Amino acid sequence: MKENAASRVLFILLLFLFASLLNGQSPPEKPKLIKCRSPGKETFTCWWEPGADGGLPTNYTLTYRKEGETLIHECPDYKTGGPNSCYFSKKYTSIWKMYVITVSAINQMGISSSDPLYVDVTYIVEPEPPVNLTLELKHPEDRKPYLWIKWSPPTLTDVKSGWFSIQYEIRLKPEKATDWETHFAPKLTQLKIFNLYPGQKYLVQIRCKPDHGYWSEWSPESFIQIPNDFPVKDTSMWIFVGVLSAVICLIMVWAVALKGYSMVTCILPPVPGPKIKGFDIHLLEKGKSEELLRALESQDFLPTSDCEDLLMEFIEVDDSEDQHLMPHPSKEHMEQGVKPMHLDPDTDSGRGSCDSPSLLSEKCDEPQAYPSKFHIPEGPEKLEDPETNHTCLQAPQSTSGEGKIPYFLANGPKSSTWPFPQPPSLYSPRYSYHNIADVCELALGMAGTTATLLDQTDQHAFKPSKTIETGGEGKAAKQSESEGYSSEPDQDMAWPLLQDKTPLFSAKPLEYVEIHKVSQDGVLALFPKQNEKVDAPETSKEYSKVSRVTDSNILVLIPDLQAQNLTLLEESAKKAPPALP
């Protein structure tokens, strides 16, 4: 019995369910959110489209939450925006916040929810259409008539505060036309329309759009009637230009017809014929080139010639090897000053390349013929720094026959600057000066050469004036014994004839600090500070007066002359070596 009762109840329930299905009752369909719109970024409204209710009463609920929050809120106002809408007032509106909105449909059979809609109020702004649209025809005196359109921004849009800016779009057309003429007016509230058709009735509409958002709806249509006498275009200027152009063209055609040849000649002048003197056109036409060239040659035309034919090529041969290895002796007496008589004849003839220092060193290694007699004092003497005065020691000394002057005073700077081979046994001590002339005078022996040099260069320079002394007089310097140069037996070098017993260097260093005379060729005539004897070393001589500077920037030093110094200089002049023949 119990089993029969349970089966009966289940059967009854199935009958009721089948009956309900036959009556069309079911859960509601899923609703759809259409859009959300904000008129001015302060409030916004959302609309949805409901689905089938399933034959039962259905309730719709809009819920939302802000991005980053978990709390779900229900729509605050279902009535302000109309049916199936939700209105958010300023209290519930936030800028730069994302809203997640969902609509749910509920009845007795079940519940259905829409897909979520993500809304940012900044980008859903859709303002109301502009208001107060005004149309008016203007007839200014100085310009053409036009249609003046004026409007006002939407009431719910705060444009004056600068919250956002609005762009406008105006469209108009004749009443019976199908296409609209569109004009764009950014941030303006008025517009002028020209070139309207007279006698037509125009329809005008306007809409607006914010910087970020959507275009508003078109405003209601406005009408205006254009009168029949309304000028469309000002063609008077074009008519005047056309008439003037036609007149100018007619005048030009008439002038060409009357004076065609003269005008063509003026515009395109003829090419002038050839006017070369002696040029015969007939000879050129006949092809007789020889006669034509003969005619040209007879008209004072200079014959052409190759410039290279006029040049003479020559080679200057210079085989004088000893001329550069040995200095040239002076040939004039140096009465008015020490002047070099020898001038190098080398004037860019290729001798410079042959007289290179490396080549001269090779030439000096070869055996050469030197003057007949040469005396070298005994006893070699090593120097402290042989590089300081190698210039004079490497060059053989020579005295002129008349002036008794070393060769470095008679030759130019070129003959005495290149190195000569130096025997390893020849050395000279370092002195307190490094002048070339001073060192060379020491090489010849200061005892005999200095006086001769002073007597031969300028005897008028012995008048001392305002002697300047840099060192104290009478100071004795201890010096070692003089040592001469030792000559090697296999070298037969040409040196001037010196005294047999005269040492090559003084026993004590000579400090030349006073100049007697400088010649025009840069030769120094030096005076010692005090006269000294070669055989008996005495106090050092200090030179402190400059006599003159030669053309070659060589100083002539004069000592503080005293009576005993003059006597010693005269004695040394008498002992000077005789001149070589």
UniProtKB/Swiss-Prot annotation:
Protein name: Prolactin receptor
Membrane topology of the entry: Single-pass type I membrane protein
Pfam families in the record: EpoR_lig-bind
Region (Disordered): 323-388, 462-492
Comp. bias regions, Basic and acidic residues: 323-349, 375-388
Record's subcellular location: Membrane
Gene3D superfamilies membership: Immunoglobulins (2.60.40.10)
Disulfide-linked positions: 36-46, 75-86
Keyword Repeat in annotation: yes
Extent of motif WSXWS motif: 215-219
GO molecular-function term, one example from the UniProt record: cytokine binding
Taxonomy, superkingdom: Eukaryota
Stretches of the chain found on the membrane's Cytoplasmic side: 259-581
Protein source organism: Ovis aries
One record GO biological process: positive regulation of cell population proliferation
Residues holding Zn(2+): 211-212
Keywords, in A-Z order: Disulfide bond, Glycoprotein, Membrane, Metal-binding, Receptor, Repeat, Signal, Transmembrane, Transmembrane helix, Zinc
